[in-house]
Regions:
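A short alpha-helical cap/connector motif
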Residues: 1-131, 136-157, 162-189
Length: 189
């Protein structure tokens, strides 16, 4: 069920397109938790953040079925722009890659399958934009592993879909509330 704000945004912005609709439909058909999909409104926001920031190197933690990574890649304005994305569930890889192929962004995204904590230790950075939408219990640990890889003032939206108001999630995400404001930084609620 959409909120009034989501209905307004959808009514006043461009459609998500056939490839993203395909990813959304396949997510609903082929996964147990389709509500984890970023969706059209958040996807449009991510595309816009990428375009406005001019980000060239993007990191996404939590790929799920590839919808948000596709949106980030679609927003790249530089021909050499790239998205690195991390997903722990290897069973989603075929769906992810098929969706990116349909969206025409496969060559702009590197999918890394495995534990984000281990992968983040190896990724050199820097990243102009980081989107975190993975295991909420590990947000503060992700933050500690990426903070030195983000230039000062780089945007870092943290995805809090689901129930961010739950104390356990809210407490673990409090590290983001203490980040000094910078251009494009969107703190969690």
């Amino acid at each position: 069920m959409q909120t009034p704000e989501e209905r307004y945004i959808q009514a006043h912005s461009t459609a998500q397109g056939a490839a993203l609709e395909w990813i959304e439909k396949q997510t609903n058909i082929r996964t147990n938790y389709p509500r984890m999909l970023s969706g059209a409104v958040q996807g449009r926001f991510l595309t816009m953040m990428t375009q406005i920031s001019g980000a060239r190197n993007i990191l996404e933690i939590g790929t799920f079925t590839g919808y948000s990574a596709a949106c980030l890649a679609m927003g790249l304005t530089s021909p050499d722009g790239h998205v690195d994305t991390i997903e722990v569930n290897d069973e989603l890889e075929d769906l992810i890659r098929e969706g990116w192929s349909k969206a025409g962004v496969s060559d702009k995204i590197t999918l890394r399958i495995g534990n984000a904590m281990n992968i983040l230790k190896e990724l050199p950075g820097p990243f102009d934009l980081v989107f975190i939408d993975a295991n909420k219990r590990e947000y503060s640990e992700y933050y500690e592993l990426i903070i030195d890889k983000i230039p000062s003032g780089g945007p870092s939206p943290a995805g809090l879909r689901g129930r961010p108001y739950r104390p356990a999630v809210s407490d673990r995400c409090s590290v983001f509330r203490d980040v000094p404001p910078g251009p494009g930084y969107l703190p969690p609620p």
